[in-house]
Amino acid sequence: MIKFERICAYRVVKPQPLLTNNKIASSSLVRKLLQKGKLEKANKILNRNWSIVGKVQKGRQLGKKIGFPTCNIDIDDYVLAKPGVYAVKVLRKNSDKYLKGIANLGYRPTFNQKKILLEVHLFNFSGNLYNKLLSVEFLKFIRKEKKFNNVNQLRTQIKKDLNIAKKTK
């Protein structure tokens, strides 16, 4: 390009890399931050909230059975963040209204699952979202995944997590 600069009457300008904490802001850095659970730093570099877009799949209804119905989002092709619990906001296709919620990204160790899943519980929502496309924006990492001895312990922890997520802006 530089050798054609004079011929084509344009100027090549080499951009300066964007630095964050003396590191070049790059997709590799964002992936590393996400995998370490440093969501807020990754979002700052992205200048937006990291998100996953996927279709709601029918699950085993475990969330519903313990009082927290969830949308199970298909996430097969995504670079994923650290497994854990997150405060999220969700946008439905053809809607401009965000719904706040809480998500578990992980293996559901209390239920001995082997496949990673994204499960989202939406606040103040009831309805059928099966096969609908959702964009899930991750706002805050709340805690890492944990195996509970029983469903009652899990339910108690989910209530604590919900309180944190509801306060997240």
Question: Residue spans of the language-model regions?
Answer:
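Phosphate/ribose-recognition catalytic cores of enzymes acting on nucleotide-derived substrates
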Residues: 58-169
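Glycine-rich, Lys/Arg-enriched anion-binding loops that position phosphate/diphosphate groups
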Residues: 6-104
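Charged helix-capping and loop-helix junction motifs
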Residues: 1-2, 119
